[in-house]
Amino acid sequence: MSEPLAVDVVGNTLKYTSHAGIECLIDFNDILCVLSNHVPTHSVLFFQRTEPDGPKSEDFSLKKIDIESLPAALSPFVIKIPSHLRHEDEPPVIQVVVSSGSGTGKAKTIFQDVVRPLFTYIGLENYELYETLSAQTVGELTRSKFLERAHNGVPQTIILLSGDGGLVDILEAFYKSKTAIDVSPNIALIPCGTGNAMANSIGLRSGPVPGLSALLRGSPSSIPVFAAKFSPGSRLVIDEGRQRADIDTNVHHTLYGAVVASWGLHAALVADSDTFEYRKFGVDRFKMAANELLYPSDGTPPHQFKGKITLTTSKGPSEARSQEAVEELEHMYALATLVPRLEKEFLISPDSVPLDGQMRFIRFGPMSAEDAMHLMTLAYQGGRHVMEDTVTYAKIEQIRIDFQEDEERWRRVCIDGKIVAVERDGWVEICKERSRLLNLIN
């Protein structure tokens, strides 16, 4: 082990001379934490660009230096390893899931360059590592590993290097399981997807590698969930839109989610952009799919989605519930959500508080493509769209949609990224789930 280094604080940077005689600077914004070793020695863990000469590089690796003494300016960075990573009495089982297919494609690199070194630095030697082989891997892992441990009362922490899909797959398996949960697993998100709605909503947006600070400084909070029950003929859309599958193996036809349920423009965009025809265009597929929905190539106006929407509301836990149907039967955008953000800057529900369990409804009716784009732009400007007269924004307990569309493509519903094609004259009911079976580190 090399000798600890002498350091100085210069402005907002840490200055030191390496053992090779090179003068180095660490920006405070790049410091992850300070570990207390044997006083007075401390270790500074910090991010370093993997290509130091490329200022636009977004790839970082985690490095460590041992220092002789702790400057006062570094005191706020000192942490104690949290119990969800290391506990003297009953150590949790640490499981890392690396989703190789998630949006940015960087999950494996982030694990190798950042997460694995972190485990080494904090002395975490025993952990299980899983890399996804297909879209079914996380669900299979949950049924074979995570559920059994939760049922047997084994404390466990699941670190997901993935998009929202990894969390949704775990959630689905837990809520569809018939076994009782004795100890809820703690889930930590290291977001590697494109939207990362849950991670962005709970504030995992800071630092070179979002989510890592929360893993070290956060604590568990239970995750609120909604249940989406579909009419019996509804089918999951799979294989990039080419095939259909049963929603579940029982008669309930129910999916579970923690982020968003939508119909109309949002659901159609998610569904179309995930089809074989669009996926071959890579990241451009979202823009192309949106363009076709807003400016159809046959020259017609944007589609008017037909259906009856019924909202159930309540003024408080002990208050009676009331039902009210939306007057209009034609819609452009209808969405229920438990979170404020669908993307980092896309504030769809500004009144939402992460993990508080309140469901909110956002809707607007048929309008021109230009007016719809204006509303979406306002959502990127601090959620100002909800102040427009054309937008319905309300706190709800439940929503039911009875579809009145002939074509299947206008009867597709999005549940946390999964697409369901509802049968003709079918319906969906989305309501808040009472039980909370999973915890999120935040």
Please describe what each predicted stretch is:
Residues 264, 271, 331-369:
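Active-site beta-loop-alpha substructure in enzyme catalytic cores
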Residues 60, 101, 105-112, 142-143, ...:
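Short coil/turn segments at secondary-structure boundaries
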